[in-house]
Amino acid sequence: MAASSSSVSLLISCSFCLLSFLALSSALQTAASRRDGRSRISSLISQQLFDSFFLHKDDPACPANNFYTYASFLQASTSFPKFGNTGSQVRRRREVAAFLAQVSHETTGGWPTAPDGPFAWGLCFKEEVSPQSDYCDSTNKQWPCYPGRSYKGRGPIQLSNFNYGQAGKALGFDGLRNPEIVSNNSLVSFKTALWFWMTEQKPKPSCHKVMVGRYVRTRDDLAANRTVGFGMVTNIINGGLECGLPNDGRVNDRIGYFQRYANLFGVDTGPNLDCQYQKPFN
């Protein structure tokens, strides 16, 4: 027997209602997940604690004043649910402290006799000052440079080179055509830093995996004396310039920030803070 027109209409109506319900349910789950992500990170680091880390980031003397906000940091972290959410409470706090310490060094405005000390001036800059080049790798066919664009360091992690292309693809923006967005949009800026932190780029592991104790050293790591800890993270970020050197001031600055932040978090730093005896990753 053929279905009546009223039955067909009812079936279509019910199907539409079901699709609408599923779409609404998905949207609510996404919103809840984002709220959970914000509350997860905010339970580790409150606005007050965040501000105590970065005592001078909004000083008029800092070019990035009022750019790096606590709200943007929390919102960016929702895109990376494992950040600050892996392992014990100590490991979680230590990871967040390590991340903020590394980005503080990359954006520091401090000096040895600075007010409140040299490690209270993180997030002072949002882009590299007087870069030596436009950081274009003309041989890279996968991530080709766009004419007239500079791929100098920008954002908390000072994203540079072809990382603009990779980060843009992962986060949904055109990093090669519009690298300036990293220093113009606070949310995108923090997202690029967290993307770098969470993403493995072989032969380098992710900074996240190292700091939460989930990384198992390879044979090459053992041969290069790359020990797991904050020093290996420095090696991942800038080992070619800073590791394997005696008492490097840049490495010490990173460690100084980490020690201060870990203390404010009430956790220890863990072992292997420097990379003096480590060979850089290839």
Where do the PLM segments sit?
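Context-dependent free N-terminus signature
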Residues: 2-3
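Cleavable N-terminal signal peptides of Sec/SRP-targeted secreted and luminal proteins
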Residues: 6-27
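Folded extracytoplasmic luminal domains of secretory or organellar precursors
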Residues: 28-282
